[in-house]
Swiss-Prot record:
Entry EC no(s): 3.2.1.139
Stretch forming the signal peptide: 1-19
GO molecular function ontology, one term from the record: alpha-glucuronidase activity
Cellular component, GO, one term: extracellular region
Highest classification ranks of the organism: Eukaryota, Fungi, Dikarya, Ascomycota, Pezizomycotina
Gene behind the chain: aguA
Family assignment from sequence similarity: Belongs to the glycosyl hydrolase 67 family.
Catalytic activity as recorded in UniProt: an alpha-D-glucuronoside + H2O = D-glucuronate + an alcohol
Function: Alpha-glucuronidase involved in the hydrolysis of xylan, a major structural heterogeneous polysaccharide found in plant biomass representing the second most abundant polysaccharide in the biosphere, after cellulose. Releases 4-O-methylglucuronic acid from xylan.
Protein name: Probable alpha-glucuronidase A
Keywords: Carbohydrate metabolism, Glycoprotein, Glycosidase, Hydrolase, Polysaccharide degradation, Secreted, Signal, Xylan degradation
Localization of this protein: Secreted
BP GO annotations: xylan catabolic process
Transmembrane segments: none
Record: glycosylation sites: 50, 149, 222, 262, 279, 310, 465, 527, 576, 610, 682, 723, 732
Length: 840
């Protein structure tokens, strides 16, 4: 039971808190009103049935003491002896409760890491199957209090699956691959950081949502992590995580015996290689006795692996598994294996087939402490994919699902995208193996195929930024991941409401507003990025951030759309295409094979159709594209006004931080909308029935203005500039001026200016009306926003600034002065003069 419903009406009108950085996340333990009667109804003592400081039970006692004080102003003493339930919280394991208190008969049956929480007036029992479970129960109790829930309860809960891990793609130099929240909290300059204070804070957050394992380094691993001095550093990290019930594991580079060990081979059948890995494993466990195990990316995207020596992927995984077996360690072996040099000229080639092609023949050949870690979809964390068919093809192999909290393809934390509704499309999908219920969530738990291991992994990539992920709102995804890994049937809306109450307080207006924004965010992003199963139409060859649909095709990466002037989509049918649909069990395969039974939202994933193909909605494919992109961008505009309605209810620091990102998202969603619509309008030659695409009556194109020191510039990709053209200063030392006489009716408008904010310079612009300064700004988004910057004029650097409520008279003279800096030539795309209520 995680839900917390405030029982005091006054809690819905709590005022603004002091400024907050976000460092505490959902563990901020904000004060909840608790008068004298409330205070007297709370326990006065905390009994921890383990006094060892490295014990999660001891930590539970400290968390309870701190939480009671911060949330309710209650000072509770902590002791490790006694079993009196009078005005006490007793926290410990089932075994300790039975031994020390001569009790425990009433404790329900618990699975590994499960706990029982019993609240009876001033008597609280928190009993875990393990010490980790006891800590989880303590966090559960505190979560209830922090949400104003003082209910008397008695219930037991156990995890959905034994493996609930997070992955960090941290590099030894301190950078983080696909990380948008600052540098690594673990590594710097090739070694483990001396200051690991952020690690302890991260451990608290993870434990509070019941995460029990972490891989601390990038799957594209650097063998230098295995040097003795770095092993010592890993031990320091593990010592910090241990009291929070979190076991540390590491990613391995398959070729380490050669690159680090100076062996002539890394063949997994070679005795010297086997011995080398055995010695490394022994050294690690000597330092970290409870190490979780290894994560391995092999024979994928240039990473070395066993197939170099004509060994199977199972051969490679089992080599590590046997080294770990004496210590109880686990190998998480990624199923993300594919050839990124395949030819699109072959109609039957399909990257989506790779996982099943590689792993299905190996089912039953992996050792029992190997878990195959499978991305939720067949390609790569796209805005919508079908469930990976590999889940339905490994009956005799342990599996785990791989999700992504970091928004690599989904806005990189510069766009609000609440991900659980996307994840639930996969977790709740019934693969119908052998015509029996086979939900993905029941397969990864081990339940469906009676497997001993299984579970969850999520790529998180927190960094040293005080918001952890680069955005306050993005933390809802980390919170929700932990919640779902424990209980995947939870409702996405209920989860985000709990997170909102814990993060922003109990004000009903805040809860309702942020719930609406969050639940609308993924559909909006899908609408303005890529829909109908076409994938996220981002630049797959560069940043994975802004729009560039052409980048999907014409290369070996296999994220093809096969779009031409007549048709679009991948034919993945057995009858005519790549035969991918046939990788599913019969009932699902039949659904996807037939265009009539394929859901519209996956039509272009499974079928190659004309732009004029009618959907079940009655719209053509191309008109759906146009409409969806306009709808998505319009929704993104509403996020700003919704958030602004909370101005007086949220501390200024977090309010402004979020507002900056939502304003940016509103502008960038229009960049996305126009780029995708212009691209397919140009490609298909089919007009928008509503005459919006290519028609912008409120715009003034920069290249049509009177230019002095500015020159026109043909932007590439062409669709990422209005009318395909921008302006740049004639040189990096030249100030540019663009002027125009405005031919709009006299009135009050929002004045928007679309420009490009490139990495490598911080240009400065000033906008004037009749020589009166309207506003000025600097191109410094690389210092403000989290997404990967670009050195080009493109869909990544394109953005908008808006000056609101500007009084304009017909015939006013608009002037923009741009001063270049570094490599950035003060680029401008267009000006838009928007009447109230109009979305450009």
């Amino acid at each position: 039971m995680w839900s917390g419903i405030p029982i005091f009406a006054l809690l819905s009108s709590i005022g603004i808190a002091a400024a907050e950085t976000g460092l505490d996340g959902w563990l901020r333990y904000a004060s909840v009103p608790c008068n004298g009667n409330c205070q007297r109804a709370l326990p006065s003592h905390i009994v921890t049935l383990n006094s060892t400081r490295s014990s999660p039970v001891y930590v539970a006692g400290q968390e309870l003491q701190d939480g009671l004080h911060q949330i309710l102003g209650k000072h509770a003493s902590v002791k490790s002896t006694g079993c009196s339930t009078d005005s006490s919280i007793i926290v410990g394991t089932v075994e300790a409760y039975r031994q020390v208190c001569n009790a425990g008969r009433q404790v329900p049956q618990l699975d590994v890491d499960g706990f029982w929480l019993s609240i009876r007036e001033k008597s609280v029992l928190i009993v875990g199957q393990s010490e980790r479970g006891a800590l989880y129960g303590a966090y559960e109790y505190l979560s209830m209090l922090a949400q104003g829930n003082f209910s008397q309860v008695s219930y037991a809960t156990s995890p959905h699956a034994p493996i609930r891990w997070v992955n960090q793609w941290d590099n030894m130099d301190g950078s983080i691959e696909r990380g948008y929240g600052g540098p690594s909290i673990f590594f710097k300059d090739g070694v483990i950081r001396q200051d690991l204070s952020r690690v302890q804070q991260y451990a608290r957050l993870l434990a509070s949502v019941r995460i029990n394992g972490i891989i601390v380094n990038n799957v594209n691993a650097n063998a230098s992590l295995l040097m003795p001095s770095n092993m010592d550093g890993l031990a320091r990290i593990a010592d910090i995580f241990r009291p929070y019930g979190i076991r540390v594991g590491i990613s391995l580079n398959f070729a380490s015996p050669s690159t680090l060990g100076n062996l002539s081979t890394y063949d997994p059948f070679d005795s010297s290689v086997i011995a080398w890995w055995g010695n490394v494993t022994d050294q690690l466990y000597a330092r970290i006795p409870d190490m979780a195990g290894y994560l391995v990316k092999a024979n994928s995207e240039g990473q070395p692996g066993p197939t170099t020596y004509n060994r199977t992927l199972a051969d490679g995984a089992n080599m590590f598994a046997r080294a770990l077996k004496p210590y109880g360690g686990v190998v998480m072996f990624r199923a993300f294996v594919y050839d990124h040099h395949i030819s699109e000229d072959n109609w039957y080639n399909d990257r989506a087939n790779a996982a099943v092609d590689f792993f299905k023949p190996l089912d039953g050949k992996f050792d029992d402490n190997v878990v195959v870690q499978i991305k939720y979809g067949p390609i790569d964390f796209q805005v919508r994919e079908p469930a990976s068919p590999l889940f339905a093809n490994l009956y005799k192999t342990n599996t785990a699902i791989e999700l992504q909290v970091t928004q690599e393809y989904l806005g990189q934390q510069s766009h609000l995208v609440y991900l659980p509704p996307l994840w639930q499309t996969i977790l709740g999908f019934d693969l119908r193996v052998d015509q029996k219920p086979s939900l993905v969530r029941d397969i990864i738990s081990g339940q469906r195929f009676d497997r001993p291991l299984g579970g969850w992994a999520a790529v998180v990539n927190v960094g040293t930024n005080s918001t952890w992920l680069g955005s306050h709102l993005a933390m809802s995804n980390l919170y929700a991941y932990g919640r779902l890994a424990w209980e995947p049937t939870l409702d996405s809306e209920d989860i985000v409401q709990d997170w909102i109450r814990l993060t922003f307080g109990l004000d009903r207006r805040i809860v309702d507003t942020l719930t609406q924004m969050s639940m609308e965010s993924w559909p909006a992003y899908e609408n303005y990025s890529g829909n109908l199963g076409i994938q996220t139409l981002t630049d797959i060859l560069y940043t994975h951030y802004g729009p560039n649909p052409a980048s999907q095709d014409g290369n070996g990466w296999g994220q093809w759309t096969r779009a031409d002037h007549l048709s679009i989509g991948m034919d993945r049918t057995v009858k005519n295409g790549t035969k991918f649909s046939g990788q599913y069990p019969a009932e699902v395969a039949a659904m996807y094979e037939n265009i009539e039974t394929t859901p519209d939202n996956l039509l272009l994933w499974f079928h190659h159709v004309n732009y004029t193909q009618r959907l079940h909605s009655g719209k053509t494919v191309i008109q759906h594209f146009y409409d969806a992109h306009y709808t998505g961008a319009e929704t993104a505009q509403t996020f700003v006004s919704q958030w602004e309605s909370l101005r007086e209810r949220i501390d200024a620091e977090r309010y402004q931080h979020v507002l900056t990102r939502l304003i940016y998202q509103a502008g960038h969603s229009i960049v996305w909308r126009d780029a995708i619509n212009n691209f397919y309008h140009n490609l298909s030659g089919i007009a928008d029935e509503k005459q919006r695409v290519g028609h912008h009556p409120w715009r003034v194109e920069a290249e049509d203005m009177q230019l002095d020191g500015y020159v026109p510039y043909a932007v590439s990709p062409f669709e990422t500039a209005s009318n395909y053209t921008a302006i740049v200063t004639a040189s990096n030392g030249t100030t540019g001026t663009a002027s125009a006489t405005l031919d709009f009716k006299t009135g009050t408008y929002d004045l928007g200016i679309n420009y490009y904010d490139m990495y490598g310079g911080k240009s400065h612009w000033t906008v004037y009306l009749n020589d009166r300064v309207v506003g000025q700004w600097q191109g410094n988004s690389e210092d403000v926003l989290s997404h990967t910057p670009s050195i080009y004029l493109d869909g990544h650097s394109a953005t908008r600034i808006t000056f609101r409520d500007v009084k304009i008279h017909k015939g006013d003279r608009l002037k923009i002065v741009g001063k270049p800096d570094g490599v950035e030539p003060a680029p401008l795309d267009y000006v838009v003069v928007l009447p109230p209520g109009i979305v450009d």
